[in-house]
Design a protein with these regions (language model features):
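Phosphate-binding P-loop
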Residues: 1-6
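Conserved lysine of the Walker
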Residues: 19
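Conserved substrate/cofactor phosphate-moiety recognition/catalytic segment
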Residues: 23-67
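Hydrophobic anchor at the beta1->P-loop junction of P-loop NTPases
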Residues: 11
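Conserved phosphate-donor/acceptor-positioning beta-strand/loop module used by diverse small-molecule
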Residues: 99-120, 153
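Glycine-rich phosphate-binding loop used to anchor ATP phosphates in small-molecule kinases
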Residues: 57-100
Length: 176
């Protein structure tokens, strides 16, 4: 379907659930079928030390980046970030995007065992246990606080291609 309205696909979830991997696979599948879109990794919009969170840098950078995509005719954005499916964050992100976007929110979920396995593949040293603990706490927080209308998608024992295809279907993003 051709649209002039901005559509945003928010993908959130705990560390180790597969947000980035799924985001890149959605990008690959949409590209293969000719669906115009952009992919923005939210963590990269304010990754700095000391953390600039109190200055809303992620939102300011999202406004600037999206303005450039929008000027080139893009109307669909995939946005990945842990907390992107929480109501306050959704409100802040849609305000940063402007244009009253249509939002599809997807909370990726996995078991503690799966998250531990995935995190142990990328985290090294003594920080792994802390990271696993924070991930489990965030999983509970996201599950409790994400709005009911946000889709919950389980990632355990599934291929990335299958998860991405399901999410593309939830967003209704098909080739025009």
């Amino acid at each position: 379907r051709v649209t002039d309205q901005t559509e945003v696909l928010l993908i959130g979830g705990r560390s180790g659930v597969g947000k980035s991997t799924v985001g890149y696979e959605i990008h690959a599948q949409l590209s293969a079928t000719g669906v115009p879109h952009c992919l923005i990794e939210g963590d990269n919009l304010d990754m700095a030390y000391p953390p600039p969170w109190e200055h809303s840098l992620a939102e300011k950078n999202l406004t600037a980046v999206w303005a450039n995509y929008h000027a080139l005719g893009y109307r669909r954005m995939i946005y990945t970030n842990t907390a992107s499916v929480l109501k306050k964050v959704i409100t802040d992100l849609t305000a940063a995007i402007g244009d009253d976007p249509h939002v599809t929110a997807v909370l990726l979920r996995c078991s503690d065992t799966t998250a531990h396995h995935r995190l142990s593949q990328r985290e090294i040293g003594t920080a792994l246990d802390q990271h696993v603990e924070r991930s489990a706490l965030m999983a509970r927080t996201l599950d409790e606080r994400a709005p009911r209308w946000a889709h919950r998608v389980q990632t355990d024992d599934r291929t990335v291609a299958d998860i991405a295809a399901e999410i593309i279907g939830l967003a209704g993003w098909v080739a025009e």
